[in-house]
Curated annotation (Swiss-Prot):
Compositional bias annotation for Acidic residues: 977-990
The PH domain, residue ranges: 434-549, 1261-1397
Annotated InterPro entries: DBL_dom_sf, DH_dom, GDS_CDC24_CS, PDZ, PDZ_sf, PH-like_dom_sf, PH_domain, PH_Tiam1/2
Subunit structure: Component of the Par polarity complex, composed of at least phosphorylated PRKCZ, PARD3 and TIAM1. Interacts with NTRK2; mediates the activation of RAC1 by BDNF. Interacts with MAPK8IP2 and CD44. Interacts with BAIAP2. Interacts with EPHA8; regulates clathrin-mediated endocytosis of EPHA8. Interacts with PARD3. Interacts (via PDZ domain) with CNTNAP4, SDC1 and SDC3 (via C-terminus).
Impact noted for substituting R678C: In a colorectal cancer sample; somatic mutation
Keywords: Cell junction, Cell membrane, Epilepsy, Guanine-nucleotide releasing factor, Intellectual disability, Isopeptide bond, Lipid-binding, Lipoprotein, Membrane, Myristate, Phosphoprotein, Repeat, Ubl conjugation
Organism: Homo sapiens
A molecular function (GO) term: lipid binding
Taxonomic lineage from the root: Eukaryota, Metazoa, Chordata, Craniata, Vertebrata
Gene (UniProt): TIAM1
Name this protein carries in UniProt: Rho guanine nucleotide exchange factor TIAM1
Length: 1591
């Protein structure tokens, strides 16, 4: 047949007679000699025919015996003869019943628990075929395969004590049946399954001879022709050494060793004594699992002995061409190994390409000899490699395995070849489709070596092949390069390209049109094409094939849509991990404990690796998307920028800094250990249900439905006895204690009946279950499956959210239906239920309030559990005497919200604060009440004769995931401070959390994520599964809008609480201490007091705005939120300038580290900080509190943007929110600008304050929050004392509320001159600010220039008036602005602070008056703003305090819609009721009396938001001068006749204006006073006829 081993088998088994068989005697057809030999029972069922060109599958494929019977042949003969098979026509007849296998791609979600189902010798009934020899020549097979003996005692003291396997590959052995063996590999104890195919050497030839010597001692045993291998027990041997299952010949060396792993490091030198070997019972069926090493079948070996000894040496099985010193040896030098894999490669491949059990999950590895089959059409693909790598992956001693597998040289590393990916059954035909073919030059580039290292391939030589891309595999054919291949060509090599990245290599020094392919195994290859077009076509073809494989795995047809969704998920993951990493780095800077630092560093390292993996996957998917859309590939520079330092070091060691090397390093790192650890920890049930076909989703993964719904007799006819028998051999190793010994009894093999064998798997009894929509379906519950496992499986299959449903069992007891709700971790396999019900949970709102008595407690405890990356809150226990029990709270309920705050956004400190409050609002998801007449079982009936419990479930409800327990039963929780209510449960759980991320890190991240998260992302950082996406889709825009509004309010309340805590915990105590000066306190806290007052006021306006709609929770349409959105947006617009308070705080924040570093040297300061944070939580440190204002001010635009995105683009509120977003962005820009100014000129401002003389400083502070304007002006009259000027100097002019500052700063030329002359000492002392001058507001005047063109020339005159008491002369500054507009702005700012000065004198107060209170907005776009004062820049123009209080009271009554809440004395009570029909415009007009502004169509909204004083004039109209005299006259009348009822509020308000105008005339006449009057008519601030303007 062309295989050296096969010929050697003939030689050893049949004697010298067959030794000289050449290629013509062993063709690729299945030939049988006329000699009568042992009969083999062919496994019934479906037979898999491998074909690389086309791969299809039929659910009703007949087995080989069926095919024979249908074609008039007798399948089996009791006397063991098969005379009819002597004719070559047998091949054609048999081939009619063969169908190829399909593949299912699962590389995206790798799993170790692959359920590879193997056949038991499909063609054992053909004695003279090579399959027969495969079974018969046990010693020959063993001799090459390993020649090792190992003891085995897992299933008895004498069961399979030794094992040696000869590696053999047969042509027609490719004809497998993937499920005839009927056992799932994941159902086996994978701890003891491995192989000894690792290391072979020619020095062990005598072991081979011993093996041959033992061959004739075995006694065959046959099963009847009607039997089949339906479980692993079918393959188990009896204790009688002469008996072999299924008639296979017994061999002393044929025992299957299941605990080889412990002996693998010593395989090379370990040999058992022959005496021990002779007592070994045989287990011959392992011989049907051929070696993963492949051999070329295109050439035979003239010397079989040399062939079998050399071709299998080392991890790399060289082809026979290598041995025969032909063209093949040259190929060995090329670095492209044959169809071989090493241990590490198989481990990695198992991780990268998991497969769960399904009828199409047979995995095939394409090797150099796999193309040889009975028909010789093309490369057949065998499943043997699968079993081998699964055995290696499932071992528990992975370290020993890796050590043994990696003990070879670089030349033996075989990371070149991989298996074709699995595919969906519906897309099987595409597997063999040739996507691209052509002549390529190939060279090995990078090789994944042991210990997850990637190294340059040592044997690198360009080799020319004809390359064909079929599915996700590149097949290499030997060709002259000018012509293609025919259908009989055999691929020499194959490269697995699934999940690969292809990049052009234009920088190759010697060749053109080179591209590099790096796959998910950590290997890379170079290819050279003939042209640039061909290069691009190859890249597109490979990427397109990979994209199709991704879609095939996800069972999606729309590949583009899938890729875009995966890209979006990856971006969310990247964003999440970047925030986590930043928070970890921030925490690292403040942690001093070495253990904590190490934990944080380890976690940061994990995040870095995760980010690299996510970025690589993101780049890969973008490459696939670009290939499908015909676009340009993504820029690799951006990907390489994310490489961490260790990765860069590794790439530097390779000397290759490219996407290919980056991908290889990441794949080598994650493909072997990370995936293995993750997948080995998965439960068996979870791994089995990964890769299913959509047509089988209604069934369990391990069940195969051949025809309609089975009858009860068909499903349950076998009873529990058959189940018990089939489980005895399969589940004996599932128990975690692998050393437990159990007698293996060969069960009776069930007779196969294709007509009634509906469920073909281990005789598991399927269970009916009923979905919430009363739809029945079937599933299989296995031993060890918990209620949680079953619920998750069913919900995932039917796209349900498992957290919103629960599992209920129906029992029929005494003809009465009873129900039972199992615990999540309860094993339901043991329960004798009649039916499973999937029932939806209900959502309830519970409000609990404590009374003043100390005996009242909530009486429940919470557990926070992280499930699939989502943190959930569950009720752990409920006390019967507590308030929670009286309200109906039950243990096991899931808490969705606490006080309108989503549970997944709460950390431990927040939960503690909530539980300490006197009232608690809970939104819980609980079980509904039972229907009437239905009883609930307490102790359901269990199986009596079923198999014993095989171990605890791998999933535990509260122990398998990190979490913490919170108890709300603090005795004095209502009286103690929030920070002091942390209970003992919380502390102990914090220690648990610290082992992974540390409590401080979790708390800091949860809080910062709430502050920094820019979008309403899903709560899970992992990939969103189907049920989660379905749940997210169920949220309407109204629900999302409500959620964002609640988030805005809740985070604002939390922020205000944090600010108060900062003041109470740090600011006030520090003011009483002496270790910090007042200046240092100012640096730390700045204007914190003003910020707290403002935020309290702002929070109140937000709350009042939300209360505009009393039934906010019931709104179902977005347009119903109109009033609320206008109010919220108006709040930000109205207080936009007030937010500039933050500029001072943020500017001084840069100095905070310099002050806090004092704690390192000042023990008293350090002791104070420790005392204020006794639990040493990072979230409670002073630094953490001081950063919150900066985080919050940057959060506002993000929250507004979320509201903006959820509104209708054509609606008025959409525009309104857009303006609010832009305004808050301007505030953020202003804060950033102020911070830059402070960094540059802050020292000058401090020096000017310090240089003031006199007992009382005229200017107390130059705060950045008081800076109204900064600009550059030219000083036209500089004094001669400052030196000569080549041109007029430019001054930086700053207009503060308390002073005007002029500063001249030398340019960079002077600095360069000094540095260039090496006068460093002078440079250090040199002050760049040559001139600085401060003019307090009290001594400031603005004079009009006499020249007519002064305004046109943008010149103004600022005067620092003289002071006789200080002996200061008058000083005049002639300043030229950059433009007339700039001059206008400058003078406007100066006039505003002068007006503020006059107003303070009028009110005889030193402090600025309180700001005008908020009035809610609604209705027409910005109508309510048209009469409003633009806020902060004219905050100094507020009225008196008494007037402000009166207006605040009236405004409060105004925006309270609830009639019960409106005071009976409200002058506008009748206007408080909103219209029932939703006529917002009419209601707003009534509320705000907007009729007087309707005619002002020329007013721009930008004017409303600006600081223009001229806007005030536009509001008053164009006839201000004409109306002024009339208004003053009305004012005098109002003063004489104050008590008259005809006096209206407009005239009385003008009395106030008269006083202001009179005082404003100090610096000018009545004309200038009229310009500076800024009060705007707002009839809505006070009722007519009741406003008293007396001051």
């Amino acid at each position: 047949m062309g295989n050296a081993e096969s010929q050697h088998v003939e030689h050893e088994f049949y004697g010298e007679k067959h030794a000289s068989l050449g290629r013509k005697h062993t063709s690729r057809s299945l030939r049988l000699s006329h000699k009568t030999r042992r009969t083999r029972h062919a496994s019934s069922g479906k037979v898999i025919h491998r074909n690389s060109e086309v791969s299809t599958r039929s659910s009703s494929t007949p087995s080989i015996p069926q095919s024979l019977a249908e074609n008039g042949l007798e399948p089996f003969s009791q006397d063991g003869t098969l005379e009819d098979f002597g004719s070559p026509i047998w091949v054609d007849r048999v081939d009619m019943g063969l169908r190829p296998v399909s593949y299912t791609d699962s590389s995206v979600t790798p799993s170790v628990d692959s359920s590879i189902v193997l056949t038991a010798a499909s063609v054992q009934s053909m004695p003279d075929t090579e399959e027969s020899r495969l079974y018969g020549d046990d010693a020959t097979y063993l001799a090459e395969g390993g020649r090792r003996q190992h003891s085995y005692t897992s299933n008895g003291p004498t069961f399979m004590e030794t094992a040696s396997f000869k590696k053999k590959r047969s042509k027609s052995a490719d004809i497998w049946r993937e499920d005839s063996l009927e056992f799932s590999l994941s159902d086996l104890s994978q701890e003891h399954l491995t192989s000894n195919e690792e290391i072979l050497g020619s020095a062990e030839e005598k072991d081979c001879e011993e093996a041959r010597g033992m061959e004739t001692r075995a006694s065959p045993r046959q099963l009847s022709t009607c039997q089949r291998a339906n479980s692993l027990g079918d393959l188990y041997a009896q204790k009688n050494s002469g008996v072999t299952a299924n008639g296979g010949p017994g061999s002393k060396f044929a025992g299957y060793c299941r605990n080889l792993v412990s002996d693998i490091p010593n395989l090379a030198n370990h040999k058992m004594p022959p005496a021990a070997a002779e007592e070994t019972p045989p287990y011959s069926n392992y011989n049907t699992l051929p070696c993963r090493k492949s051999h070329c079948l295109s050439e035979g070996a003239t010397n079989p002995q040399i062939s079998h000894s050399n071709s299998m040496q080392g991890r790399r099985a060289k082809t026979t061409q290598d041995v025969n010193a032909g063209e093949g040896s040259e190929f060995a030098d090329s670095g492209i190994e044959g169809a071989t894999t090493d241990t590490d490669l198989l481990s990695r491949r198992s991780n990268a390409t998991n497969s769960s059990y399904s009828p199409t999950t047979g995995r095939a590895f394409v090797g150099s000899d796999s193309g040889s089959s009975s028909t010789g059409d093309a490369a057949r693909q065998g499943v043997y490699e699968n079993f081998r790598r699964e055995l290696e992956m499932s071992t528990t001693n992975s370290e020993s395995l890796e050590e043994a597998g990696s003990a070879h040289s670089d030349e033996q590393s075989s990371g070149t070849l991989s298996s074709p990916g699995q595919s969906d059954i519906l897309l099987t035909a595409a597997q063999g489709t040739v996507r691209k073919a052509g002549a390529l030059a190939v060279k090995n580039f990078l090789v994944h070596k042991k210990n997850k290292k990637v190294e340059s391939a040592t044997r690198r030589k360009w080799k020319h092949y004809w390359v064909s891309l079929k599915g996700c595999t590149l097949f290499f054919y030997e060709s002259d390069g000018r012509s293609g291949i025919d259908h009989n060509s055999i691929p020499k090599h194959a490269v697995w390209v699934e999940n690969s990245i292809v990049q052009a290599v234009p920088e190759h020094p010697k060749k053109d049109f080179v591209f590099c392919l790096s796959n998910s195994l950590g290997d890379a290859f170079l290819f050279q094409t003939t042209s640039q077009t061909e290069l691009e076509n190859w890249i597109t073809a490979i990427h397109s094939a990979c994209a199709t494989a991704v879609a095939r795995h996800h069972h999606k047809e729309d590949t583009l849509r899938l890729l875009k969704s995966e890209i979006k998920k990856l971006e969310q993951k990247i964003d999440m991990d970047e925030k986590m990493k930043k928070m970890g780095e921030m925490q690292l800077s403040s942690v001093t404990d070495s253990k904590k630092k190490k934990t944080i560093l380890d976690q940061i390292f994990v995040w870095e690796q995760n980010l690299e993996q996510f970025q690589m996957d993101l780049f890969r998917f973008r490459c696939y998307l670009a290939s499908l859309q015909g676009g340009e590939l993504p820029n690799p520079k951006r990907l390489l920028a994310f490489a961490s330092r260790p990765t860069k070091v590794a790439m530097g060691r390779l000397g290759i800094f490219s996407v290919s090397s980056f991908h290889a390093l990441v794949a080598a790192r994650t493909g072997e250990t990370g995936v293995r650890r993750r997948t080995q920890a998965m439960s068996r049930s979870a791994s089995k249900r990964r890769s299913r076909f959509s047509s089988l989703w209604g069934l369990d993964t391990t069940s195969k439905k051949k025809q309609g719904r089975p009858s009860i007799n068909q499903v349950f006819g076998e009873g529990t006895e058959a189940v018990k028998k089939s489980l005895e051999g399969i589940f004996d190793d599932i128990v975690p204690d692998g050393k437990r010994e159990k007698e293996v009894v060969l069960p009776n093999v069930h007779q196969h009946n294709p007509d009634c064998d509906i469920w073909v798997h281990e005789y598991f009894t399927p269970s009916w279950f009923c979905l919430p929509n009363n739809q029945p379906a079937l599933t299989v519950v296995r031993p060890g499956d918990t209620a949680r496992d079953t619920l998750e499986l069913i919900c995932k299959t039917h796209q349900l959210d498992h957290s919103a449903h629960y599992l209920r069992l129906k029992f029929l007891i005494e003809n009465k239906m009873q129900l039972y709700v199992p615990q999540p971790e309860e094993d339901i396999y043991e329960l004798l239920y009649k039916e499973i019900e999937i029932c939806p949970k209900v959502t309830q709102s519970i409000h609990i309030e404590k009374s003043d008595t100390a005996a009242d407690t909530y009486g429940f405890s919470l557990s926070s559990v992280e499930e699939d990356g989502i943190r959930r809150l569950y009720v752990n226990s409920v006390k019967e005497t507590g308030l929670a029990s009286k309200k109906g709270l039950k243990a096991g309920d899931e808490i969705l919200e606490i006080n309108n705050r989503a549970a997944d956004a709460l950390n431990s400190s927040m939960l503690k604060d909530f539980l300490s409050q006197p009232s608690l609002g809970l939104l819980v998801r609980t079980y509904p009440e039972l229907e009437e007449g239905v009883e609930l079982l307490e102790s359901p009936p269990h199986r009596v004769d079923g198999p014993a419990d095989l171990g605890e479930s791998p999933l535990a409800f509260l122990t398998s995931n990190p979490g913490h327990s919170l108890c709300s039963e603090q005795g004095s929780s209502a009286e103690t401070a929030p920070e002091e209510t942390e209970g003992p449960d919380l502390e102990s759980s914090d220690e648990t959390d610290h082992s992974s991320k540390s409590t401080e890190q979790v708390a800091a991240f949860c809080r910062s994520l709430h502050e920094m998260n820019p979008s309403d992302q899903s709560p899970s950082p992992q990939d969103s599964t189907g049920p989660q996406l379905a749940t997210m889709r169920q949220l309407s825009d109204a629900d999302k809008l409500r959620k964002v509004i609640c988030e805005l309010l809740e985070t604002e309340r939390t922020y205000v609480k944090d600010l108060n805590c900062l003041m109470e915990r740090y600011l006030k105590p520090l003011q009483k201490e002496t270790f910090l000066t007042q200046d240092e306190l100012d640096v730390l806290f700045g204007n914190l007091t003003e910020m707290v007052e403002f935020q309290v006021e702002f929070l109140k306006t937000l709350e009042d705005g939300v209360r505009l709609v009393p039934d906010l929770e019931k709104l179902e349409k977005v347009d119903q939120f109109k009033k609320v959105l206008f109010s919220l947006g108006g709040s930000f617009l109205y207080y936009a300038d007030r937010f500039k308070l933050y500029s001072a705080f943020c500017a001084s924040h840069t100095k905070v580290p310099k002050v806090l570093v004092k704690a390192k040297t000042d023990t008293a300061f350090k002791a104070f900080l420790d005392a204020q944070n006794p639990k040493q939580q990072h979230s409670s440190t002073l630094e953490s509190y001081l950063i919150k204002p900066i985080q919050r001010i940057l959060k506002y635009p993000l929250l507004l943007r979320e509201l903006f995105a959820l509104t209708d683009a054509e609606s008025e509120e959409h525009y309104h929110l857009d303006v609010a977003i832009k305004t808050m962005n301007k505030v953020a820009s202003h804060i950033n600008e102020m911070q830059k100014i402070h960094e540059e000129f802050g020292a000058v401002f401090d020096q000017l304050i310090a240089e003031q003389t006199g007992e009382k400083k005229e200017v107390a502070d130059l705060s950045m929050g008081d800076l109204l304007l900064h600009t550059t002006v030219i000083w036209l009259n500089p004094p001669a004392s400052l030196g000569k000027w080549k041109k007029e100097p430019e001054l930086a002019a700053f207009v503060f509320k308390t002073a005007v500052v002029l500063v001249y700063k030398d340019g960079s030329k002077q600095k360069k001159k000094l540095v260039g002359s090496h006068r460093l000492s002078i440079y250090e002392d040199w002050d760049p600010f040559r001139f600085r001058h401060m003019i307090p507001t009290e001594a400031l005047q603005v004079r009009a220039l006499a020249s007519a063109d002064a305004e046109a020339n943008a010149v103004c005159e600022i005067v620092h008036v003289k002071s006789e008491s200080e002996g200061r002369p008058e000083r005049v500054f002639h300043l030229c602005c950059s433009s007339p507009e700039s001059r206008k702005d400058f003078l406007k700012a100066v006039h505003s602070i002068l007006r503020d000065k006059h107003r303070r004198q009028l009110l005889k107060t030193e402090s600025l008056p309180s700001s005008q209170q908020y009035v809610p907005f609604g209705g027409k776009r910005l109508c309510a703003l048209k009469g409003a004062r633009p806020a902060m820049s004219r905050a100094v123009s507020a009225p008196s305090k008494s007037l402000g209080r009166r207006r605040r009271r009236l405004a409060r009554n105004r925006f309270t819609i609830d009639s019960d809440a409106v005071s009976a004395s409200s002058p506008e009570k009748e206007s408080q009721q909103p219209p029932g029909g939703g006529d917002t415009d009419r209601w707003v007009e009534e509320q705000f009396d907007l009729a007087q502004y309707e005619e002002q169509d020329d007013i721009k909204e930008t004017d409303i938001l600006s600081d223009d004083d001229e806007f005030c004039e536009s509001v008053k109209g164009a006839s201000v001068d004409r109306d002024l005299q009339e208004r003053l006259q009305a004012t005098s009348i109002s003063q004489r006749e104050r008590g008259r009822k005809t006096l209206d509020s407009h005239a009385s308000r003008m009395a106030q204006l008269k006083k202001q105008a009179a005082l404003s005339g100090i610096n000018g006449g009545l004309e200038s006073a009229s310009e500076e009057v800024i009060w705007v008519r707002r009839e809505d601030f006070a009722p007519s006829r009741k406003l008293n303007t007396e001051i």
